[in-house]
């Protein structure tokens, strides 16, 4: 049982965050995990371009979050053992996961993507573009399927009142 943290000095973790076994977080330029987050087993986060995960996020098993990606056109060298000066087309762009996002199992998120608040991403989807807030996405590539109810916002407020009350007691 283990979770690996590479460049841990580049990783910040908030309150009430759980990282399950067999996860790998590679700090890169920075990974910031806010509060009330669950990262299920087998999640890989590559922080070469930066990753921000806001409050109340659920990341299901075997999700890959890439904020850096090699070039697949043949115009650059690849592999981590090769210095970046030989990778002129390396893509680095921050991934931002908004509040109250749920990411289904087996999802891959590519560099530069922002998941809007309340987004839900269906299992085994490939997210290549930003998502709208309070929307359900699925597929390869992920496309909007439906809207998501915002009813949970009231529950979130109730939870925070109770949680903060317990913390200050």
Report each predicted region and the residues it spans.
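Acidic, carboxylate-rich catalytic segments that either coordinate divalent cations
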Residues: 145
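Acidic/histidine-enriched, glycine/proline-rich intrinsically disordered or flexible terminal extensions
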Residues: 155-169
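Flexible, glycine/small-residue-enriched loop-and-beta-strand segment within the central core
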Residues: 2-13, 18-111, 140, 148-149
């Amino acid at each position: 049982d283990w979770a690996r943290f590479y460049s841990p000095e580049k990783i910040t973790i908030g309150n009430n965050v759980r990282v399950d076994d067999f996860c790998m977080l590679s700090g890169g330029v920075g990974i910031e995990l806010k509060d009330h987050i669950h990262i299920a087993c087998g999640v890989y986060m590559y922080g070469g371009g930066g990753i921000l995960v806001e409050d109340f996020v659920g990341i299901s098993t075997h999700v890959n979050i890439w904020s850096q990606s090699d070039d697949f056109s043949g115009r650059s060298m690849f592999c981590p053992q090769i210095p970046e000066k030989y990778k002129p087309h390396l893509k680095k762009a921050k991934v931002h996961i908004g509040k109250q996002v749920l990411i289904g199992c087996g999802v891959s998120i590519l560099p530069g993507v922002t998941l809007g608040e309340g987004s839900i991403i269906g299992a085994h989807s490939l997210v290549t573009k930003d998502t709208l807030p309070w929307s359900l996405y699925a597929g390869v590539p992920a496309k909007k399927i439906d809207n998501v109810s915002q009813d949970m916002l009231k529950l979130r407020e109730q939870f925070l009142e109770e949680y903060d009350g317990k913390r200050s007691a």
